[in-house]
Design a protein with these regions (language model features):
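Inhibitory N-terminal propeptides of secreted protease zymogens
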Residues: 19-139
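Hydrolase catalytic cores
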Residues: 225, 243-248, 370-443
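Subtilisin-like serine protease catalytic core
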Residues: 34-35, 152, 164-202, 211-257, ...
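Solvent-exposed loop/turn segments at secondary-structure junctions
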Residues: 46-50, 102-104, 114, 131-135, ...
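N-terminal domain-start motif of subtilase-like serine proteases
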Residues: 19-34, 97-99, 109-116, 139-182, ...
Length: 467
């Protein structure tokens, strides 16, 4: 009955075409049957492909100029593409935010009436709900006050992080600062392991609340950031400067927040959204989140494409839907470094998602320690906790990548990936398992990918000119 009422409302507005139009997502129709308003995302026909191709085909004197040109071109593209709709919305009381990184427009608390009107614009090709795509359960593991030892945690020893950093400092006289961004629940900026490596200005953005300083009401983001750049034996590369965007408000992540964070990564602003400075963009971005992957799941593809053009290395957790084959999550399943999780004994963690992807692509790309990993807790400045998940494995991938970029900051994505693959350790606990027609004793495979990360071996492959 409620769906019939919804259609009647549209008809009374004179919008029969909108009712029948495939522009309006079926899920959005169902949402309006339950609630009178909802946040929506509008997709425009122009898209970003032409801009990305143009920027990719041109040469720029340096990365900063590339990023500025990319962000400017995408912004102008969205203004031209969306001008009629933006002008229309300006005559209403609805709040909107342009997503130039994907040529989309977010509208807050949209109504049935508004959707019917928006669907009539010929340049609009799709209108869908700004869904909550991923949820975090709040960490419940015990809180530890202080660390029992200043020595590196077992997971850092596994990936030979300290040895790699020592080698890096022995062979490099002018090591550049590497900026690493997390898109997560935030970070406790005052934590003893993290306060010294925070980038500071241009290091934080909260799309929802526009909070001034990094914060974390969940703990997931603090933990993963600690594994990347934490001091005191918990971080893979503590010399990195961390940045963070709050793509997940407390226990959930919306499409808008994640896309908006992806846009901020390309050209960071101050926390209030002002004074963009593309030169502050991170060199890599760590994403410890994943959603179910179907052929229709493409909503983050354009963000990843833009990152590649802007020379931002994307690292993703592969998902926690194992142990069955074909369970890899999105976006770790596309053209990114997708990281699975291993245990203290170098077996695959039972929760770690396994490939192949639904398109037959080999995934995960690599694996890293992800079970029983100790890192910073959000509950106190000297508190820690142990967590498990591919969320914990992903920041190892980011940390190792940061070490490699510190050796050669201008490396391409493909060369970074080649170094990770070349150095990966294949002396792992296999079981003869077959996924996608590949047994796990043959590398690469769909269980371990190319192997478990080894920062030292990967760095040595670069220094020795093996790749």
């Amino acid at each position: 009955m409620s769906q019939i009422l919804f259609l009647i409302v549209l008809l009374t507005l004179g919008s029969t075409q909108a009712t029948l139009s495939p522009k309006i997502s079926p899920n959005l129709v169902l949402k309006f049957n339950q609630d009178p308003t909802t946040n929506i995302i509008i997709t425009f026909a122009t898209g970003t492909s032409a801009v990305l191709s143009y920027i990719s085909e041109n040469d720029f004197p340096d990365r900063d100029t590339l990023l500025f040109s990319l962000a400017t071109a995408l912004d102008i593209n969205s203004v031209q593409s969306q001008s009629s709709v933006r002008n229309f919305l300006a005559t209403t009381n609805f709040t909107s935010d342009p997503l130039w990184v994907t040529d989309q427009l977010w509208v807050k608390d949209s109504t049935v009436e508004l959707v019917s009107q928006l669907a009539e614009f010929p340049e609009v090709i799709e209108i869908f709900e700004d869904e909550l795509t991923f949820s975090f359960s709040e960490p419940s593991s015990p809180i530890l006050t202080g660390r029992s030892s200043p020595l590196a945690e077992w997971n850092l020893e596994k990936v030979k992080a300290e040895e790699a950093v020592t080698l890096l400092k022995n062979v490099s006289t002018n090591i550049p600062t590497i900026r690493v961004c997390t898109i997560d629940t935030g970070v406790r900026v005052t934590h003893e392991s993290l306060r010294g490596s925070y980038l500071g200005e241009y290091g934080w953005f909260d799309p929802g609340l526009r909070s001034d300083l990094p914060n974390d009401m969940n703990g997931h983001g603090t933990h993963v950031t600690g594994t990347i750049a934490g001091l005191g034996g918990i971080g893979v590369y503590p010399d990195a400067k961390w940045m963070s965007c709050k793509g997940c408000a407390t226990n959930f992540c919306s499409m808008y927040d994640l896309i908006r964070c992806g846009q901020w990564v390309l050209c960071p602003s101050l926390p209030n959204g002002s004074r963009r400075d593309c030169s502050k963009a991170p060199h890599l971005v760590s994403n410890s989140w994943a959603v179910a992957y179907t052929p229709e799941t493409t909503w983050f593809d354009d963000v990843v494409r833009a990152w590649h053009v802007g020379r931002v290395v994307p690292v993703f957790g592969i998902g926690n839907d194992g142990p069955n084959c074909g369970t890899v999550g999105y976006p770790g399943s596309i053209d990114v470094i997708g990281v699975g999780a291993t245990t203290t004994t170098d077996a695959i963690a039972p929760f770690s998602s396994v490939g192949p992807s639904i398109h037959g692509v080999l995934k995960p790309d690599v694996t890293a320690p992800g079970q029983n990993v100790l890192s910073a807790a959000h509950t106190g400045d000297n508190e820690y906790r142990v967590l498990s998940g591919t969320s914990m494995a992903c920041p190892h991938g980011a940390g190792v990548t940061a070490i490699l970029l510190a050796y050669n900051q201008t490396m391409s994505y493909d060369r970074v990936v080649e170094a990770l693959f070349t150095g990966a350790d294949t002396n792992l606990v296999t079981t003869g398992r077959v996924c996608g027609g590949v047994i796990d004793t043959t590398f690469p495979n769909h269980v371990f990918g190319h192997g478990r990360l080894d920062a030292l071996a990967s760095l040595e492959s670069l220094i020795g000119g093996k790749i």
